[in-house]
Regions:
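Selected transmembrane alpha-helices and immediately adjacent juxtamembrane segments
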Residues: 1, 106-127
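Hydrophobic/aromatic residues within the transmembrane alpha-helices of Major Facilitator Superfamily
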Residues: 8, 12, 16, 85, ...
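Juxtamembrane transmembrane-helix termini in multi-pass membrane transport proteins
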Residues: 2-67, 128-145
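Alpha-helical transmembrane segments and their lipid-water interface positions
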Residues: 45-57, 83, 124, 157-165
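Flexible interhelical linker loops that connect adjacent transmembrane helices
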Residues: 92-108
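Selective transmembrane alpha-helices of multi-pass membrane proteins
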Residues: 64-95, 151-161, 169-179
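Small-residue packing motifs within transmembrane alpha-helices
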Residues: 3, 7, 69, 73, ...
């Protein structure tokens, strides 16, 4: 098995779990709002974090202690509480399946995408720590190939997720499909 395919399979196996970030990508796909940009931000962020983990794992392993982990978890908690509160506020509004009316600003989508990406502790555990630890004994060129494989999996996954939900949005926006 080549290091590219090893990175691809390993990266894909880590990203397949449906968490807050992936649900947000699906939601943006269903709404048909900034799908390309949301997927790009998620995939490029993964690429940066994957290569950061591969080449700086030893440093991060010593830097991240329980205090830093607690700070990240508290930031994530605050972000998720804000998101939940905003969803509760929308709860009393009638569900609007018309994607043309329900548009939100680019800035709002951008900030939410950045929040779901960088305030998510699983992003760091998967990209920086797991992939970094997995590849720590690889030669330099093998690390690059491994990172390219994992990053390719991320790009394919996010764009497939975003545009598949966009493609199926008419079905998913049908009130009968949710009953």
């Amino acid at each position: 098995m080549t290091f590219v395919s090893l990175g691809f399979i390993t990266g894909l196996s880590l990203i397949l779990a449906i968490g807050a970030q992936n649900i947000f990508v699906i939601e943006q796909g269903i709404k048909k709002q900034f799908v390309f940009i949301v997927c790009l931000i998620c995939a490029v962020s993964d690429l940066l974090l994957i290569f950061t983990g591969i080449f700086l794992f030893e440093y991060f392993q010593n830097f991240f202690n329980q205090t830093i982990e607690l700070i990240f978890n508290l930031l994530l908690l605050l972000f998720l509480l804000y998101f939940i509160i905003s969803k509760f506020r929308e709860k009393h509004k009638e569900i609007n399946l018309n994607t043309e009316i329900a548009k939100i600003s680019f800035k709002n989508v951008f900030l939410k995408t950045i929040g779901f990406t960088y305030l998510n502790p699983h992003v760091y555990s998967d990209t920086v720590f797991f992939l970094g630890n997995f590849s720590k004994n690889f030669e330099l060129t093998d690390k690059i190939y491994f990172g390219l494989g994992a990053s390719t999996a991320s790009f394919i996954f996010f764009y497939l997720l975003g545009y598949a939900s966009n493609y199926f949005s008419n079905f998913l926006n049908n009130k009968m499909s949710w009953k």
